[in-house]
Structures are given as C-alpha cells and as structure tokens.
Regions:
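Cysteine-dependent hydrolase recognition
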Residues: 5, 30, 78, 104, ...
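Beta-strand-rich solenoid/repeat architectures in extracellular/passenger domains
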Residues: 8-23, 33-47, 57-71, 81-97, ...
Length: 666
C-alpha cells in the first residue's frame, strides 16, 4: 500500500483501499504533523490493518465506509495531539477478533459521524473457534483523548441454544464489545445512542458451544476502565432475540463515569427473552469507585438497571426508570432499579416505577425452583425492588424522589446485611393493580401473607441463608409511604434488623380494593423473626382503609410506638394507643414508675425501657407477666421490688436491689 516516513507528510487518496494479505497495511504513515485524507472505501481482512498512523499533531480524515474482517484493524492511530475525522457512513466490524478503530496516545481528538456496527460473521468457517473472543468497535487507550460519535454504536450478540435440562443454562452466548476506553481523563460523547441486538443460532453448527451451557456472555456495548467520562445521548435500544438474556451492557470501573443525558432514552423491545436457571442481572455494572449518573428515560424488561459495587462507587437518578416484569420464564424477574453492595451507594431524585405486567411472573422461589436468592426480602412472592442495599450497601430516596410499585411481590426499598436505606421522598405501593392487557393469573403457590402483596421499605431476608444482620431502614421526616389495599408500609425480619418511621405511613384504598381481604393484610409496620419496628415520636400512621391496622408481629418481633396512630380522624399517641394494641410494647422512660411499693401488676403485653427522657425507670412493687426489654436507659428495681417477668437487656442497664427472676443479655 502507501508507506510514508518523515514529518509533515501529506497524503490524499480518493480510491478504495483493499488489504487482504496477512499482516499487511494499506496506509502506513510514520512521522509528526502528518496529513492523510481518504474518500474511498476501506476493506481489510486476514490480520491486516487499513491505516496504521504513528504521528503527533497530525490531521487524519476518512470519508469512505470501512469493513473490518478477521483479526484485522480498520485504523490504528498512535501518537499525541492528533485530529481525526471519520465521516464514513458505516464502519462495520464483521471479523473474528477484529477492531474497527484503535486509538492510543494522549490528547487526540476523534470525530466519528457515521454508524459503527460490531457483528461477527457467524457463518464463517472459523466462527466456532472464536465464538468467545470479542471483536471491538472502538478501542481508546492513553490519556486526555476526546472521542465523539454522532452515529449509532451497535453490537450484535448471538446465542446458541440446546435442549433444556433442569437448573442449567439453555446454551451459550458469544462475547463481543462496542466501545472500550482505558486510561485517565478521556472523554467520549455518544450522541447517537447505542444498540444491543440479539440473535440466535447463527452458527452453521453451534452444537459444541451450545453444549457448554455458559449462559449469557460478556456483551458490553460500553466498557470504561479508568478515570474517564462517557456522555450517552440519543435513543438507545435493546432488541431482537435474547433467549439467554444479557448482562452488563455498560461496564464502568476504576473511577470511570457515565452520564445518561436528560434527552437520552434507553428502551427494551425484545422478541425472545429468557434467563432460565439464572437470576436477573443488571443492565449497567459500576465498581471500584466508578460513577453512574442517569438523567434520561429508561424503560427495561426483566432486568435491573444498575449494580453499584465497591467503596466510593456511586449511582444517581434524576430521570425516569421504569422496570416492567413479564413472564419470560420461571426465573425472569425484573430486578432492581439500583442494587448497591460492598460500600457502593445510590440516590434517587427522580422517579423509579416498577410494574408487574403479567401476574404469572411473580415467583415463589423456594416452592417453584428450590432456589435461594439472598437479596430478596420475601422469597415466597418475589418481583421487583426500587432501591436495594445488600452487604454494606447504601441507598437513599431523596426528598425529590419517587418510587412507585404496581403489582404483587414488590419492595420499594430494601436493606440486608450491614446495609442502610433511607427515604425522604415518596414511596407508593399498589399491590392489587393488574395491567389491563394481562391475561395471566397469579401462581397457586403465592399466598396471602401481607408480605406477599408488597412492602414499602424492608430489612432482612427470609431466604435459606438466614436474615443477615444489622440492617436499618428509615422513613425520615418528610418521607411518605402510601400503601393501597394490601401490603406493609415497613417490615423488619431478623434480630438486629430494624425499621424506623420518622415520617408518614398512609394505609389507603382505591378502585383496586378487594373487600374480601381480612385482618393482617394491610399493615403500617410489621416485625418478624425477632426484627424490630419503631414508630418514632414524629412518626404518623394514617389508616383510611377498612382492613388497615397499624402494627403486626409474628410473636417474636418487637414493636415500639412513640408516635401517632390515626384511624380516620381519631388519633392516639404513644401509650394511649399502645394500651389498645397487643402487638405493641408498653413504653417506659426516665421518671416513670412501673409499680410503686406494695403495688402488684401483671403486664398483658411486652414492655420496653428507653431513655427518651432523662432519669431512671423504677419498679418498687410486684411485677409479673410479659417480657420487659431494656432498649436504652436504666431500669432500677428497688429493695422492695420483685420482677417475675423475663428481662432482656438489649442496650441499657439493670440495677437490681430486690428480686428478679430471669435476665438475658442480648
């Protein structure tokens, strides 16, 4: 081809360039301040390179289209401070282990106005051998480079299927990539959106790779590794046939950042979709200090939006995220808006909406599959979650945020295992909502436990792994949880797991109300398996539905009510209400006397000692009956006092000068 060495060279080519000899190069330029312009078509194959340019302060332009075949590179640019314009209508990467554009060096500016397609030719004789070897559309390495793509970046992923066997994948999906960015301070603008297209059984004989049963592959349209930024705009889509589902369409790590713009959309319209024997995944993975910012409109089916993992990894939403759940298979739930773990965090200032579009998609994990999904609150009716913090995760629904859940088995916010969830915005739950076009019915093994309808905020899990520990969710002052018809406002499962209401919980009914619903179907706060539910002094529970009740405990849980309960317009606060509800504990704080000397009292419901007010709680008489828990502060049993109740010290003190029957230090 063309071989130029030396500085300030100028090459203008108007013809086509075809490079097919092994390891050959169509245009080779080595020297600074080079100028190269080509208006013809470039076709490379067989380990060839269309343009290999090593220059600094150069000007490179390509106006013709480009096809890149096996083991080849369309354009390889190395050097600093170059200006590159690729005005080709199409850049097609169709070969095995091929790369469309490879940019290395620093401070290069690359402007691509056409479309980029990465679609390995699965009819090729070597397609099976390189099924798991990815081809790449654009590879950027180095620092401070700027890349702008005005067209659409499309990646096509093939899935090869075999016969279904129990609890194993239905086949294998290829590995393939769109944009790969490494290094620091690179900036990429994807103005035309991205597209992931699925297809199936494109290999002439895919039985070998299908029998590997690897499930979905690595199909990232965008991968960023390093402190670089990607700005995604335009309309993005996921479509075609994805019989093994997909995962990680966007992957960020090591302080990378992606912003999905305010005018951007991501929509999912698939023809075939299933992920049998594999739980739902996420569209975007963020780890090791990376950041995801969503300002756009996201509409997904049966896949979570983003997983945020690792210290200083963050996600935020000020746009709209809609999760839709269809019956694509036994294990095909729509997942989570934001899932955080291992120090990752996410905040919502926008709207997250989850809709069960087909009732049959609600799964009883244990009964239907015998599976254990550790990040699920209630495995007997599993659907979607708005925000989920698991294993040292943190999520927050800010004052401007809204989480809306429609259909059975949903949880607005969940915290499990040393995790925290906080709400200062709006959470709405309508478990009896059914989509107007839904022709399916609920599975027979989905029961009528209040948890099976849905929960606004929850801690813990009832899965086989155990409830985990030290998880906390708080409905903060200003936060509002509204539950229509059936379900629970806040629920705690497991010892050391706590839900706290400082805001408002509304129990309401609407047009979906079912008058046959009985007791324990619509609950403000509930505690299971030694969990704790606290309605603080600022907390209010409004009950405006016939089947509504403020509290529920399975007998092991603890309910502490310091706040106000309103049934229609009749409101009671603290012990004035607690004395009417056997699920709650009687509250004693500094200055209170349980029994005076020579008095006798039998407690018919649990009691709790706290330090809401200064001073000690004193007992000088004879006391029996239900358990007494010391949550904070000090209980003083004087020399004339006798306590026959079981005393449980959680976090406080007992000073005994009299007689006590049983003391347990928790």
């Amino acid at each position: 081809g063309i071989d130029i060495t030396g500085d300030s060279a100028t090459v203008i080519n108007k013809g086509n360039i075809t490079v097919t000899d092994k390891d050959s190069v169509g245009v080779l330029i080595n020297g600074d301040r080079a100028t190269f312009a080509n208006t013809g078509h470039i076709d490379v194959n067989n380990s060839a390179t269309g343009m290999s340019i090593t220059t600094s302060e150069g000007a490179i332009s390509q106006a013709g289209s480009m096809n890149v075949g096996d083991f080849s590179t369309g354009m390889a640019l190395s050097g600093n401070n170059n200006s590159v314009t690729l005005a080709a209508k199409d850049l097609n990467v169709i070969g095995q282990k091929a790369t469309g554009v490879n940019i290395s060096g620093d401070n290069n500016a690359v402007d691509i106005t056409g479309n980029i397609l990465v679609d390995k030719d699965q009819t090729a004789t070597n397609a099976v051998d390189y099924f798991y070897e990815p081809s790449i559309g654009v590879n950027v390495s180095g620092n401070c480079n700027t890349v702008s793509l005005d067209g659409k970046l499309t990646v096509v992923a093939d899935s090869e299927l075999t016969s279904r066997i129990y609890a194993d994948f239905d086949g294998s999906q290829e590995n393939i990539s769109g944009l790969v960015v490494s290094g620091d301070d690179n900036t990429v603008y994807l103005n035309g959106g991205i597209q992931l297209v699925g297809e199936e059984n494109q290999l002439t004989d895919g039985s070998t790779v299908a029998s590997n049963r690897n499930g979905y592959g690595k199909t990232p349209v965008i991968t960023v590794d390093g402190k670089s930024s990607v700005y995604l705009n335009g309309d993005s889509t996921i479509n075609g046939d994805l019989p093994l589902a997909y995962s990680g369409m966007i992957r960020l790590k090591n302080s990378a950042m992606i912003e999905i713009g305010a005018d951007a959309t991501i929509n999912m319209q698939v023809d075939i979709y299933d992920h049998y024997a594999r739980s739902e995944s996420q569209m975007i993975f963020v780890e090791s200090g990376a950041e995801l910012v969503n300002k756009g409109d996201i509409d997904t089916r049966n896949i979570g939006f983003a997983a945020i993992s690792g210290e200083n990894s963050t996600g935020s939403n000020s746009g709209n995220i809609t999760l839709s759940q269809y019956n694509y298979g036994l294990l095909a739930n729509a997942g989570v808006g934001y899932f955080t773990t291992k120090g990752g965090s996410a905040v919502n200032n926008g709207t997250i909406t989850a809709k069960v579009m087909e009732q049959e998609s609600v799964i009883n994990l244990g009964a239907s599959l015998g599976l254990n999904e550790a990040n699920t609150f209630y495995s007997d009716a599993n659907s979607m979650m708005g925000l989920d913090a698991f294993d040292h995760g943190y999520v927050s629904n800010e004052s401007g945020g809204s989480i809306e859940m429609y259909g059975r088995g949903n949880v607005g916010m969940l915290a499990i295992d040393e995790s925290t969830a906080e709400n200062a915005g709006q959470i709405t739950l309508d478990a009896l909502w059914v989509d107007a076009d839904d022709t399916t019915t609920l599975r027979s093994n989905i029961g009528n436990d209040a948890r099976s309808y849905g929960v606004g905020m929850a801690v813990g899990t009832n899965t086989y792994s155990g409830p985990r520990k030290n998880a906390t969710v708080v409905n903060k002052q200003g936060g509002v949880i509204t539950v229509y018809n059936a379900g629970i406002g806040m629920a705690a499962y497991g010892a050391s797991n706590t839900v706290i209401n400082e805001g408002i919980i509304n129990l309401e009914k609407n047009a979906n109300y079912d008058s046959s619903l009985g007791a324990d179907s619509l609950i403000g706060m509930a505690a299971y398996k030694s969990g704790t539910a606290i309605n603080e002094q600022s907390g209010v529970i409004n009950i405006n539905a016939d089947n509504g009740q403020a509290f529920y405990s399975d007998g092991s849980g603890t309910i502490l009510n310091y706040g106000t309960i309103c049934v229609n317009t009749n409101c009671l606060t603290g012990n004035d209400y607690n004395e009417t509800d056997s699920y709650t504990s009687l509250l004693y704080t500094g200055g209170d006397v349980i029994t005076a000397q020579n008095e006798t009292q039998n407690l018919t419901q649990k009691a709790s000692i706290n330090d809401k007010k200064e001073g000690n709680v004193v007992n000088s008489g004879s006391l029996s009956g239900a358990d007494i828990a010391i949550s904070s502060g000090e209980l003083v049993n004087t020399s004339t006092g006798t306590i026959n109740n079981a005393i449980i010290i959680n976090d406080g003190e007992l000073s005994n000068e009299g007689s006590v029957a049983k003391v347990t230090l928790n």
